[in-house]
C-alpha cells in the first residue's frame, strides 16, 4: 500500500500540470516499488584452471559484481514503515472518533466535519456577491460605492475599466471617436500606487500624471498625444480640472470617471470643481459614466444623511452600500478595539539642548519649525525625543537645503540682498549642526526621558512582540517628525522581535530632515509586506488608499479627528484576531468627547445605510433565501440509492463549498465557489465557477424567476455534474484525493522488479534466412580500423560478404593494444559480386581457417550453411558506395590460404622467415602468438627468461612452448630439433570484449614470451589480417546488435538510424533507470544505454498525445485531457503494447558474450560447444518499467532520425505504434491538422478589443495572429464568468497543450547542448526552465500580468504584490538573468498564461512547431545560456537536499523516505504520514493532507535532526558503515517532490 500511496499528491494533481509545476520529481524512478536483487551471475572460470583444456580460450575472465542484500533491505524498510503507520493509525482513531459529530441528520452526516471545521455556512463567495452586483450596477448607472476599507472597491473599479475599455475598442472598430478613462486620486502617492495596480491588471496603456511632472506646461498637442496613446490615465484631480477648463480635454472624450476616496468631493476640492464646472456643463449624452469609491460619504463633522445626499447630487450618482454589517464582517474582519489610557502629560518645557539652541541660534528663521516641534515634543514625547529632533533637523544631508532656504528668505525680505548676512546665517547654521553633533544625548532608558504616552506605547509593544508569533503593527501619528523620532527611539530601545520602520508622506523640497522619496516609501511598504519591517510608524499616508498589507495591530498614537480617519485607519487591521488600539489621555475631556462623537457618527452612518431605498442596497443574492427555503414543493431532488444520501437545492450550496475546500493547497486560503447571476429576458440565470484547480470548471444553470432559485438550481446541476465525473462520492463528499491521483499515478502503476523472464534474440534473423538463399551473388561491407594513435602492428581492412545487402552501419569504437580507441568504419559496397563455385569454396576455406587458427574452432566445410564470409580487402580511398567487391578483394591472399593449410616448419627454414608470423598451439586455445624477432642469444634448451608468464613446465624453452600431455611430450622431444631458433613473441591476450577498455586484471597480464616454432603451427594468414580478425568478435557482436535493433524497427514499420535504434534497446545494468544510483550488474562495452533517449521520447510522447487529444476532443475540459493522456502515456499502456508486439525480444540487456558471437548453424568438429550457452542466454529478466522505458526511448530515437517531410514524422508514427490507441492514429505530423476542426469561437469575427490585443502582442512578441480570439482565450482566467468573456473559453485547454510544447522545446535544447549529461541532470535543469517560478517572472517581463481577464479580488492582490517583488528583484540583480530564483512563487495564473500563449500560437499557425522554437530562442533561452547558474535550483528542494546530504556528505545508502495514507473514519479529512528511516531508525515523521507536503515536512525535520552532525558522528549514531561497502551495489529509495 505504502509504495503506491507515496506517489499520490492531491495538490499537484489538481494543478494544470504536475508541477511539474515548482515542485518536481527529481529522482522520479527511485520510488517505484522495490528493485529485486539480481541473481548472481554465473561465475567465470579461472583462465588457468586446466592447462590441458582444449578450449580455455572461451573462458571469460571479466569481473561480475557480487550479489547484494538490496531487496532484503527494502523489505525490512517496508515492514518498519508499515508498523509505524499502523501505530499512528491506532493512536489517531480514538481521537478522531471523539471528535466525530453524533447528532446530525442523515443528509448532513457526510459533510458535518468539514462544515464545522471550515465554518462554511452557506459558502462564502470569491468574488463576493455584493461585488458582482455592484459591478453590474456600475455598468448601467453612476454609482458611489460606500464600502468598508478592505472590501474590494478597487477590484470593482478594475472590472469596470475593463468593461469600459472593451466597449471602447469595439466602438473604435466601428469608427466612433476615441475616448479614454480617467482614474482620479487625491495624492501623488496614490497616483503611483493605483497606476501600478491598473497596469498589472489591464492590458492597455495606463499613464499616471501628477503636478511635479510639469503638466501645467503641456499644450493641447501634448494632451492629444496622451489621449491617443493611452486608454486609462491616472492623475491627481487638479490636472484633469485644468485640462477641462483649458479645453485640452473635453468631457465627451472621457468614457469613465473614477473618483478614488470620493468623500473629498466638497466645496472647492478639484473633485467638486470637475463635476460642477465641466461635467454638468456637458450635454447628458456626452457625459461619461461616474464611479466613486469611499468608506464614508463624509470626512468632517456634521449631518451624515445630509452629507451623503449632497455627495450624491454633486457626483450625479447614487450611493450603493450594504444594509447588514454582518455581510461585510464575513469579508472584512472587524478588529477588537481597545483604549490605551496614559497618565496626564506635563506642559511643554525647554530641555537643556533646547535652551542652548535657543540662546545661540534662536533668531534663525529657517529653524522656527524645529523649535515648535521640539517644544511640543518635550510634553508629547519626552526629553530624549525632543532633543533628537535637532539631530535630524541639522544632519549633514539637510544642511545644504537649509542654507539654500536662508538665501531665499533673505532675498524675499530685502530688496538688495546682503550677501554678508546670508553668509553669516549659513555659518551659524553650520555651527548649530556641530553643537548638536557634540551634544551628549541621554540614555532613553533613564527615568524622565520619555513621556507617559511613549512609555505606555513601549510597554504595550513589548507585550505584543514578546514572542515570534508574527505580529505586524502600524502606529499612526499626526506629524511626520513624530513618526520619524519614534522609529529612531524604538530602534535604540531594541525590543526583541520588533523591527521598526517609518512611512511618511512625500513633500518635495521639505527640510528639517523629514524629506523622503517615493522610492523610499515604496521600499518601506515592500519590507513591511515581507516582514523585514514589522512595526511601521506612519502618518496619514498609510490611512487612505495606500496598499498596506494586512496587519494584526493598529495603534492610533495621535487620536483621529474625523470619522473617515477612524474608519480608514481601523481598516488596516484586517487580520481575524486584530487589535485596534486608541491612545487617549486620562481625564482628558476632549479625548473622551472625540471618542464618543466618532462612535455616534458611525452608528448614524449605519442607520443611514439601512434606511436607503431598497434598490440602492446591496443584499447579495441570498437576501431572500430563508423565505425561499419554505417553498420546496416542485423542486428537484436527487437520491443516491445505495446510501440514501439526498441532494436538494438547499444542500447543493454547502456541498459545493466543501468540494471547493477539498482542493486547497497547504498554506493557501480556502478555494471558493463563484456564483454570477445575470438577467436574461424576464428571468435570472446563474453561472457557477468552481476554483481553478477543479477539473470541472462549472456550468450555467437554468433560468429562474428569482435570483436565489437560479443560484440554487445551478449549484444543484453542478453537483450532478461532479457526480457524473465521480468527483463526489455516494455521500456527496469530495473524493478528489482518491480520483485524480489514481489516474495521475497510472504512469507509475507498474513495477520495476525483475519478476518476469522474457525471450531474447541472440542473433538477427537475417543469418538464419540467408542459409536457405541460393548463393549466386554476394554483397560486401568494407570494414577498416581507424586508430586514434598508431597501433603496434598493421591492421588491414577486411570484407564481410553476405547473401543479402546489409544496411550502412555507424562508426563505433573498440579498444586495441593498450586501450587505444579505434573507430570501426564500415562501408557497404554498392554492387553485388557474382561468385563462382571455386571462388565460394576459397572464401569458405579462408573464413573457416580464421575460426580455426585464431579462435580455436574447427567447423565442417559446409558452404550452404555459411551465414557470411570473411575476405582480406584492399584499402579504400573513400566511401565505397560505388565499388565492386571483386575489385577490392585480395584474391591472392585468399588463394594462398586456400591452398596452404599452414606454413610447414622445416629444419632448413630461414629463421628470419619466422618473424612477423601468427603462430598458434593446435592443442590449447589459450596460446596464440605474434612473432617479433629471433632471439639469437637463446637456445631451446635454455630456461625461459624470468619475465615470461608462468607455466607448469619452466625447465627449458622447448618444454615451456609444448602443451602436450606426458606421453606425447616424450615422443615429441625424442624427435624435435633442439638447434632450431628461439623466437621472441607476443602472447595474444584472451580478451575478446574489445568494445570496452581493459580491466585491471587484463592490463597486468604479461605478454612477452620466448618460444620454439616446431611444437606450434604457423598460420598461412597474414598477421595484418589476423590483427583485424582478432577484433572480429567485438565487431560482429555490435553488428548483430544493430541488425536486431533494426529488425525491431522493421516490425514497427519505423525507419530509425541504426545507432539510435540500438541505443534505444540497450539496457546495460539491472537498474539502468536509476540514473545516479550505483549500477547493479553493469554490462561493459554496450555503448550508450536508453536513458537519454527515454527522457527525450517521454517528452515527445507527452506532446504528441496532447496534440492528438486537443485536436480530436475540442469540447473536453482540462480534466478529461489529463486523464485521457495519462491513460495513453502511462507505463502500463506502453508495457502492454510492448508485450503484444514482443518488443522485449529485441532489448539488449547483456554485454559482449564470448559464447554467442560465433556463426550459428555450422557443425562444430573441434573446440568447445556453445549450443547450451545459446539456450541459457536466450532468456533475460526484465522489469515492466524497463520495457515501457524502451518504448519511450524508441520514440526518442525516431525523433532524432527525422522524417521524410517533417522532422517529427517518424516520432509521430512511433507514438501511434506504441500507444496503440484509437485516440492516436496519426502516421505523420501533418495529419494532426487534418484532425482539427476549429471551434466556433476561434473562427468568429473578433471584437475590436481582441484585434487591439492581438496588435499589441504582435508589436511586443512578433507573432501575428490569424485568429485573435485564440489569444483572447489564452488570457481568460477560469474565474471570469463566461458571459463576460464573450463566449471565449478560459485558457485551461490551451495551457494543457502549451505545457507539453514548452517541455518539448526546452528538452530538445538541453538534449542538443549537453550530449553527455545524464537524464537526471537534464531533468533538474529543465525544471528551472519550465518552473512556475521562472514562467511567472517571464509572464511579467512579457506583460501578460496586465492582460489577464480575471474576476478575483485575491488574485488581483497576489499579482500586484508579485509584480512589485519580481521587478524589485530584477532592479537589484545588476543584470543577472537568474534574478527570479530569489523571488517568491508567482500566482499560478501567470505561468499558465505563458503556456496558454504557446498553445494559442501553435494552433493559430496550423501546428507549426517552429513558432514555439522562435519564441523559445527569443524569450526563454537568453535566461539559460549558462546553465551552470541553475545547478542548485532543483537541489534546494528539501527532499533532494536530504538525499544529497545523506549520500554525498555521509556516504550513506541505507535510508528511505516512505509515505502512506492514514485510514480515517467516515467524513474526516484524509491524512498522509511520511517518515525518514536511516539504518532502521525513524529519524523524522510528518503528517499532511497530501503525500507531497508530508514528504517535504518529513525531509525538513530530518535535515534539522542532522544539522551540525559530522560524518563520524553520523556513523556512530546510526551505526552506518556504508562507506566501507561502497563497492556493493545499492540503490537508495528517497522521496520525490511529488
UniProtKB/Swiss-Prot annotation:
Q: What class of enzyme is it?
A: hydrolase
What does the entry list as the binding residues for Zn(2+)? 1452, 1479, 1520, 1522
Give start and end of each Helicase ATP-binding domain.
Answer: 134-315
Domain Helicase C-terminal residues, every copy: 460-619
Gene3D superfamilies of this UniProt entry?
Answer: Dicer dimerisation domain (3.30.160.380), P-loop containing nucleotide triphosphate hydrolases (3.40.50.300), Ribonuclease III domain (1.10.1520.10)
Query: SUPFAM superfamilies in the record, alphabetically?
Result: P-loop containing nucleoside triphosphate hydrolases (SSF52540), RNase III domain-like (SSF69065)
Alphabetically, the GO molecular function entries are: ATP binding; DNA binding; helicase activity; metal ion binding; ribonuclease III activity; RNA binding
Task: Summarize where ATP binds, as residue positions.
Answer: 147-154
Is the keyword Signal in the record? no
Protein origin, superkingdom: Eukaryota
| EC number(s) given by UniProt | 3.1.26.-, 3.6.4.-
What is the protein's known function? Dicer-like endonuclease involved in cleaving double-stranded RNA in the RNA interference (RNAi) pathway. Produces 21 to 25 bp dsRNAs (siRNAs) which target the selective destruction of homologous RNAs leading to sequence-specific suppression of gene expression, called post-transcriptional gene silencing (PTGS). Part of a broad host defense response against viral infection and transposons.
Q: What protein is this chain from?
A: Dicer-like protein 1
Q: Which organism is it from?
A: Neosartorya fischeri (strain ATCC 1020 / DSM 3700 / CBS 544.65 / FGSC A1164 / JCM 1740 / NRRL 181 / WB 181) (Aspergillus fischerianus)
